[in-house]
Design a protein with these regions (language model features):
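C-terminal His-loop and adjacent cap/lid subdomain of alpha/beta-hydrolase
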Residues: 1-128
């Protein structure tokens, strides 16, 4: 646990920079509940204006395709250039990815039925 509490780790939800999290709904290494827990920490720290999350229909860990990766880069560049988030809903992200002619279709989806009712982990970053 000390590893996650070390300075420089951004697991407490107190981000100081814009952050787009991409998460695959079937990620076997980082369950959906952990993303919800991080979102809860972001909100508790009043940092919701700096944070967005995009879910991808995939059962891998960091197996984003080239279209999804390009969408993430473009979304962050737009956020950094303009100071505000553009649309980050699945339909908008999929349309952006399709417009890039990457040779593969982006797979952004709503988190829907994969949402857990509440963050259900005993340990939270910054606590002992």
């Amino acid at each position: 646990l000390a590893f996650w509490d070390a300075p420089g780790r951004n697991v407490t939800g107190n981000t100081r920079i814009p952050l787009l999290r991409m998460h695959e709904i079937g990620d076997y290494q980082v369950p959906m509940g952990l993303t919800q827990g991080y979102t809860q920490l972001i909100e508790e720290n009043g940092k919701g204006d700096l944070y967005r999350i995009a879910y991808v229909e995939s059962a891998t860990h960091c197996g984003f395709n080239v279209a999804e990766s390009a969408v993430a880069i473009e979304t962050m560049m737009r956020r950094l250039d303009t100071g505000s988030w553009g649309p980050v809903d699945p339909a908008s992200l999929n349309a952006l990815g399709a417009s890039m002619d990457a040779g593969v279709a982006p797979r952004f989806i709503d988190n829907g039925p994969w949402t857990v009712k509440e963050y259900n982990r005993i340990w939270r970053p910054g606590t002992r």
